[in-house]
Design a protein with these regions (language model features):
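Sec-dependent N-terminal signal peptides
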Residues: 4-13
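Intrinsic disorder/low-complexity segments
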Residues: 15-17
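Transmembrane beta-barrel domains of Gram-negative outer membranes and organellar outer membranes
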Residues: 19-153, 157-163, 171-270
């Protein structure tokens, strides 16, 4: 029994070390979390555009139902409209439909969908379904692992629900949004993997863009980030996104830091 337990720990550690560079900070990879596992996240986002500083807190639960299907449930709380309050929530699901594995490399493709609700009025054409807008989104993710380097691209389309009862006169009423991203992650440490207790240190660089089809307005953000993974179960993310180019005004995510802690529990779902 003890030998089986040790083997399970080694497998978990190998999983975290091999795929750690795919755990992007601002986007999701096509790969899924381990089967029958639960993850708990707490994320804090701080924005410097208001002109005052505002922040959002996102508690999140993730469920790995199988190697191909996982789901996230999020709640959004912020002080963007005065006092700190609950803004809404979101359900996100991802289905991996393609896997191609080779030694030290693999390719994954997945489809995702999201439905969100938010109490907030809109101040911008940008559609952000993680706190700012009610709506739905769908898209595709493609991820390529090449030893210590992981590359991923995402293409999505979002539709915002009508919120005329909360709309402020003269402010934009966004309807649809095309989103796209290109993400890279590199495993810096450990240089040589020995056991699952070794910390993993990863660096990321992500390009995050959106286009409003109705107005033609768009933007492209650059988002560097660092990440530490401890004991294959605890993950700490720190990142910052800033605009490289664009003409979409009043965006909340234009200059934003992200700080996240994640805790994973393996083989707990029946």
């Amino acid at each position: 029994m003890r030998q089986i337990f040790v083997l399970v720990l080694i497998v978990i550690g190998t999983y975290a070390s091999t795929y750690a560079q795919e755990l992007y900070v601002f986007t999701e990879p096509a790969s899924n979390m381990p089967t029958k596992s639960i993850g708990v996240r707490i994320t804090n986002e701080g924005m410097f555009n208001n002109p005052d500083f505002v922040s959002r807190t996102i508690p999140e639960v993730m469920l790995g139902f199988s190697k191909n299907l996982m789901m996230h449930a999020q709640a959004f709380l912020s002080d963007m409209d005065g006092k700190y309050r609950l803004e809404g929530g979101s359900i996100y699901a991802k289905y991996r439909f393609l896997s191609s594995d080779e030694t030290h490399s693999h390719f994954r493709a997945a489809a995702f969908g999201r439905v969100s609700t938010s109490k907030r009025p809109t101040y911008t054409r940008d559609i952000n379904l993680e706190g700012d807008n009610s709506g739905i989104q769908g898209g595709l993710i493609f991820t390529q692992l090449l030893h210590k380097l992981a590359l991923s691209s995402t293409l999505g389309y979002a539709h915002a629900f009508d919120n005329s009862d909360r709309q402020i006169v003269g402010m934009p009423q966004p309807k649809n949004m095309l989103s796209y991203s290109l993400s890279s992650g590199y495993l810096v440490l450990p240089v040589v993997y020995k056991d699952y207790n070794q910390p993993n240190f990863n660096v990321y660089l992500e390009l995050l863009g959106k286009t409003d089809p109705s107005s033609g307005q768009s933007y492209l953000d650059i988002a560097p980030a660092i990440q530490m993974i401890l004991n294959s179960k605890t993950r700490i993310d720190l990142g910052y996104r800033f605009q490289a180019t664009g003409n979409m005004d009043n965006r909340y995510t234009k200059n934003m830091y992200l700080l996240r802690a994640e805790f994973n529990f393996f083989n707990v779902l029946k």
